[in-house]
Amino acid sequence: MALAYTDVQVEVREISLQNRPEKLYEVSKKGTVPVLITTGGLVIDESLEIMLWTLKNNLDQTWLIENHNKEIEIINKNDILFKKWLDRYKYHVRYPENSKEYYRENCSNILSDYENQLSNTKYLLRDSISIVDIAIFPFVRQFANVDYQWFDDNYNKLTSWLAEISSSNLFIQIMKKYGLWNDNNKIKV
């Protein structure tokens, strides 16, 4: 979303994570997505780093606050703690040592913080959208999609926040589907 927000032109290469192309590993040893290669050849293979690079290298930095340590701290907590529990909640059959409800409860401990924050501000950090919202949104969306009714029943403010971002023109713009990339594909910008 940060790339689209700042109108950075990119070549999109949609891949199957079950059949990752060798070119992905040639560019990034991690073999994970997303990966951004700048026109200067810099390889960035972390979502947050891509967002920060995009926002810092464009004139419009309204998604950032002056000292963005707090933003980074919130995003890192989400990426480290919430993502761990989210994966176990979504794929609970792969983690039979605990119940689906156990994993949901661990996610809920973090979601409750977000819900409480939304009692004070329109978005997760302030009254205007920020990089925190954009970084955390996909994970909250994944959580909600496991059992939307339960999510909706328990998180009124997060449900509204999620609906607002999901219905934004920016989100709709980036969610268009692409065919799987191969060497013969034309570039999609």
Please report, for each region that a protein language model flagged, where it lies by residue.
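A short hydrophobic/aromatic micro-motif that marks alpha-helical segments and, especially, helix-coil
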Residues: 61, 148, 183-184
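GST-like domain detector, emphasizing the conserved glutathione-binding G-site
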Residues: 1-106
